[in-house]
Design a protein with these regions (language model features):
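Surface-exposed, charge/polar-rich loops and edge strands
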Residues: 1-13, 19-23, 102-107, 111-116, ...
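Alpha-helix N-cap/helix-start and coil->helix boundary motif
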Residues: 57-59, 78, 123, 137, ...
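Flexible loop residues that form catalytic
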Residues: 55, 121, 181
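N-terminal start-of-chain detector that recognizes signal peptides
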Residues: 44-45, 88-91, 122-123, 146-151
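Short polar/charged helix/loop
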Residues: 133
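N-terminal active-site beta-alpha-beta segment that forms phosphate/nucleotide-binding
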Residues: 2-112
């Protein structure tokens, strides 16, 4: 693993994560099963919106959760802004290949999101998320409020043993979901 903890070291960590996940066999069903158990225990999850995502290649596919919960997904606008919309809305393919709600779909108020399921290239045991570098989730997550559980979703093979570089705009996760289940972040 790269050892550089400086913010510029994120590029090395991204390269490490992309190489590591190439050909990685993720047990999507195990991750989803752990998330079902977790969501069933979260106060307000059944009545609120669960923010999930439509996966990029190499990310855990959470579409199996969609029928069981009131789920929302993001739409990425040209300037990089993420908005939140019902997951059952009509979709179009984003230029990066994932499905997203079509333009004009009604938005879900961020205040109505009760749990956020967040993808990433890698995570560390302290909740630091390493994204793709565009800052989309860095801008979205703070607007959800401090009490919303933020669950980093990944393969256990992409959870580092050491701290990832972190910058002031990075929003830490409160939980990690892997094939081994969902666990609270250690402090």
């Amino acid at each position: 693993m790269p050892g550089d903890q400086e913010p510029h070291g994120k590029a090395r960590w991204r390269a490490w994560a992309r190489e590591r996940r190439d050909g990685l066999a993720i047990d999507h069903a195990a991750v989803v099963a752990g998330l079902r158990d977790f969501l069933g225990a979260v106060d307000g999850a059944a009545g609120g919106w669960i923010l999930t995502y439509r996966p990029l290649p190499g990310e855990v596919d959470l579409d199996a959760l969609l029928p069981d919960w009131r789920c929302a997904v993001t739409r990425t606008h040209a300037g990089g802004l993420l908005t939140v919309h019902p997951a059952d809305a009509s979709t179009e393919r984003h230029r990066l290949g994932y499905l997203q709600p079509v333009a004009g779909t009604p938005e879900v108020a961020r205040a109505d999101v009760t749990v956020a399921l967040v993808p990433g290239l890698a995570f560390d045991p302290w909740g630091t998320r390493l994204g793709h570098g565009a800052g989309h989730y860095d801008r979205l997550l703070p607007g959800l409020g401090p009490r919303v559980p933020r669950v980093g979703v990944t393969s256990g093979a992409l959870v580092t043993a050491v701290r990832l570089p972190i910058e002031p705009h990075d929003t830490p996760m409160t939980h990690l979901a892997t094939e081994a289940g969902v666990r609270a972040i250690r402090s």
